[in-house]
Amino acid sequence: MLYREIARLHRTVSVLGLGTWQLGADWGDVSESDALQTLEAAWDAGVTFFDTADVYGDGRSERILSKFRLRHPEAMIATKMGRRVEQRPDNYTPEAFRAWTERSRQNLG
């Protein structure tokens, strides 16, 4: 696995990441055990970067990543927000961003 440094964070992450939309189970039934095994397999292959979003399984993907991170606190997790509302500029208020951020923080632990 190749790694790159994120200079501003003084962190090194894998150049390949794992997207976790499928772990949210919107796409099919994925047990928590299977989801965690998938994350562990990626970790064992050298993946240290994981991508998620607050809408993946209505936060389920973030919550599963939170459990994974208990075993791997050095994992780098990026989440996205802003897909819970109609995609119009006036829906993206500072208050909405604060609420979405807080919800993801709670989900991710």
Residue ranges and their predicted role:
Residues 1-76:
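N-terminal binding-site loop/beta-alpha segment at the start of enzyme catalytic domains
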Residues 21-33, 81-98:
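Active-site mouth loops of central-metabolism enzymes
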Residues 25, 72-78, 99-107:
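Short, Lys/Arg-enriched charge-dense amphipathic segments
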Residues 40, 88-109:
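Glycine/proline-rich, positively charged
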Residues 64-67, 80, 96-103:
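Generic beta-strand or strand-like secondary-structure segments
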